[in-house]
Structures are given as C-alpha cells and as structure tokens.
C-alpha cells in the first residue's frame, strides 16, 4: 500500500493584477465578450495639429537668413525706402525680427565708413551716395557699353584727324606747292554753295586772329587782327552768270584796306619790319 506524501507548498510568484484579471476572464465563458477590443475614439485633427506643431518647432531658419550679410541687405532696403534716409532702429529690429544688438552691428560699421550718422540714440540718417539708382543695373550696363563704343569711335576719329593733319603739313611744307597756294575768282565762282551770296576773302599773315562777336539782328561783325603784317580783304560777290568780281555791295562795311579783286599773290621781299594791322568788317542783311 502506497503512502501519500504530503503536498509541498510551492513558493508564491508575483503576478500582475492585470494579467490575473485576464486569466480569470478566460476561464469564465460568460465574460468572453470582455476580451474583445474596446473602441477607442481618436481625434485625428488633434493629432495632426500636434504633429505639425512638433515639426514647426524642429524647423530652423537657414544660417544665411540670420547672417550679417542678409541683415545688411534688408537694412539697405529699408534705408532706400525711408523718407530722408532716416530710420528708427527699434522699428528696424522689429521688421527684421532680430535683436537691436544685431542692428547696432550694422550701423556701427556704416558709421565707421561715413555712410550713416546718428541723429539720436535710436535714429540714424543715411549720408552716403544716392541709392535710387543702385537698382538700375541693366541700364547702367547698357550705358557702359555705349560709353565703350563712343570711346572706340573717338579713338578712330583722333587717328583720322592726326592723319589729315600730317597730310596737310606735308602739303603746305612742300616747296613745290608753295607757289600754287592761292585761289582765283573762278575757283570761288565754281562752288555752287557760294552762288547768290557775298563772299569776303581775307589774305593775312600767319598767326592772324579772327573774332566773330555774337551776331546782331541785321548784321554780322568780324574782327581780324594781325601783328606780323598787313591784312588784305577782297570782296567777291558771287552771282549766277557773273564773270567779274568788281561789283560792290552797299551792305558791306568799309575796312582799313580797300576791297580789290582776287589776284595771283606775288611774293615780295619784306624790307620793313612787320606792321600791326586790324580789319573790322560788318555785313548787313
């Protein structure tokens, strides 16, 4: 006959009250419905707002946006639009969304290079060059290109003038051409632009000075001065079909030298020292 040993008492284990409740419900078939997941109402709008707020808190402004260069550009935009170039630093700090210390960093640099001056503790005034034309970069570039073209054209014209002056010097300095340095009445008469006009020819030594004062309503006055010899004045009234220059006009004033027809100049040796001469011609309409 077998002997029954007394049952040993097992050590107690820690059991979660929640798990014990579940076990009891599992043993009880009546409470099976209690195991079904309960409906939980979720407010999606609140969760969306919550997530968006978290993301907004994590978003940081780029480093460039808060750099001194960026703030200086924004500051200059405010200066350009400020009446009289006067700014209130308190308002500037508010518009830029920075501390006043950052604004003072900008104004101190501009004050050091004499671009702004302090009107009061919180007010500065722009004293630099006009900022209204700083935005016209394309127009400025176009003007620079036009200026470059004009400079190139000016250089080309200077070369042409220099070349013409050299040719004229070689022409007048040639001894063979010296004896032909004159014009005749027929030469003047052949010029179409001189027809029906009064032409006054002047023969004067070198360095003769000719002054034409402001013309009057009915006349024009010409002053001719020479310190190296006499001045010869010739009246040549060119008319269509005329073949002589001996005609005179009442509208031409007299001069110290008598008017005479054009003739071939004959070189003469100067025995006397040069005499000063002055001619005053007045032509009336």
Swiss-Prot record:
Dimerization: region residues: 130-222
Q: Enumerate the residue ranges of region (Transcription repression).
A: 173-285
Position of cross-link Glycyl lysine isopeptide (Lys-Gly) (interchain with G-Cter in SUMO2)?
A: 9
Localization in the cell: Nucleus
Note the InterPro entries from the entry.
Answer: E2F, E2F-DP_heterodim, E2F_CC-MB, E2F_WHTH_DNA-bd_dom, WH-like_DNA-bd_sf, WH_DNA-bd_sf
Q: Bias category Polar residues: which stretches?
A: 241-259
Can the keyword Ubl conjugation be found in this entry's annotation?
yes
Q: Which Pfam families match?
A: E2F_CC-MB, E2F_TDP
Question: Where is the short sequence motif DEF box located?
Answer: 95-129
Q: Fetch the Gene3D superfamilies from UniProt.
A: 6.10.250.540, Winged helix-like DNA-binding domain superfamily/Winged helix DNA-binding domain
> Which portions of the sequence form the region Leucine-zipper?
143-164
Its GO CC terms are: MLL1 complex; RNA polymerase II transcription regulator complex
Which keywords fit this entry according to its UniProt record?
Answer: Cell cycle, DNA-binding, Isopeptide bond, Nucleus, Repressor, Transcription, Transcription regulation, Ubl conjugation
Please list where the region (Disordered) is annotated.
240-285
DNA-binding region, as residue ranges, is located at 50-129
GO MF, one term, reads: protein dimerization activity
GO biological processes: regulation of transcription by RNA polymerase II
Ranges annotated as biased composition (Basic and acidic residues): 260-272
The record's family statement is: Belongs to the E2F/DP family.
Q: How does it assemble?
A: Forms heterodimers with DP family members TFDP1 or TFDP2. Component of the DRTF1/E2F transcription factor complex. Part of the E2F6.com-1 complex in G0 phase composed of E2F6, MGA, MAX, TFDP1, CBX3, BAT8, EUHMTASE1, RING1, RNF2, MBLR, L3MBTL2 and YAF2. Component of some MLL1/MLL complex, at least composed of the core components KMT2A/MLL1, ASH2L, HCFC1/HCF1, WDR5 and RBBP5, as well as the facultative components BACC1, CHD8, E2F6, HSP70, INO80C, KANSL1, LAS1L, MAX, MCRS1, MGA, KAT8/MOF, PELP1, PHF20, PRP31, RING2, RUVB1/TIP49A, RUVB2/TIP49B, SENP3, TAF1, TAF4, TAF6, TAF7, TAF9 and TEX10.
Q: What does this protein do?
A: Inhibitor of E2F-dependent transcription. Binds DNA cooperatively with DP proteins through the E2 recognition site, 5'-TTTC[CG]CGC-3'. Has a preference for the 5'-TTTCCCGC-3' E2F recognition site. E2F6 lacks the transcriptional activation and pocket protein binding domains. Appears to regulate a subset of E2F-dependent genes whose products are required for entry into the cell cycle but not for normal cell cycle progression. Represses expression of some meiosis-specific genes, including SLC25A31/ANT4.
Protein name per Swiss-Prot or TrEMBL: Transcription factor E2F6
Q: Which gene encodes it?
A: E2F6
């Amino acid at each position: 006959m077998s002997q029954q040993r007394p049952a040993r008492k097992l050590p107690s284990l820690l059991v979660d009250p929640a798990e014990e409740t579940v076990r009891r419900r599992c043993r009880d078939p009546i409470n099976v419905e209690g195991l079904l997941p309960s409906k939980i109402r979720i407010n999606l709008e609140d969760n969306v707002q919550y997530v968006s707020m978290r993301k907004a808190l994590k978003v940081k402004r780029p480093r460039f946006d808060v750099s001194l260069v960026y703030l200086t550009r924004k500051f200059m935009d405010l200066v350009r639009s400020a009446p009289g170039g006067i700014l209130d630093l308190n308002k500037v700090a508010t518009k830029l969304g920075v501390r006043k210390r950052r604004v003072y960093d900008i104004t101190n640099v501009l004050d050091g290079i004499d671009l702004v001056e302090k009107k009061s503790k919180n007010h500065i005034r722009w004293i630099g060059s006009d900022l209204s034309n700083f935005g016209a970069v394309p127009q400025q570039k176009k003007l620079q290109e036009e200026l470059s073209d004009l400079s190139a054209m000016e250089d080309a014209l200077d070369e042409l003038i220099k070349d013409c002056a050299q040719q004229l010097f070689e022409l007048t300095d040639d001894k063979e051409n010296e004896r032909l340095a004159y014009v005749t009445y027929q030469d003047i008469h052949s010029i179409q632009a001189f027809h029906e006009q009064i032409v006054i020819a002047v023969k004067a030594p070198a360095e003769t000075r000719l002054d034409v004062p402001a013309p009057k309503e009915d006349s024009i006055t010409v002053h001719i001065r020479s310190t190296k010899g006499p001045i010869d004045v010739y009246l040549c009234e060119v008319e269509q079909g005329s073949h002589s220059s001996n005609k005179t006009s009442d509208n031409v004033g007299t001069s110290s030298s008598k008017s005479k027809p054009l003739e071939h100049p004959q070189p003469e040796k100067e025995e006397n020292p040069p005499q000063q001469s002055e001619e005053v011609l007045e032509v009336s309409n």
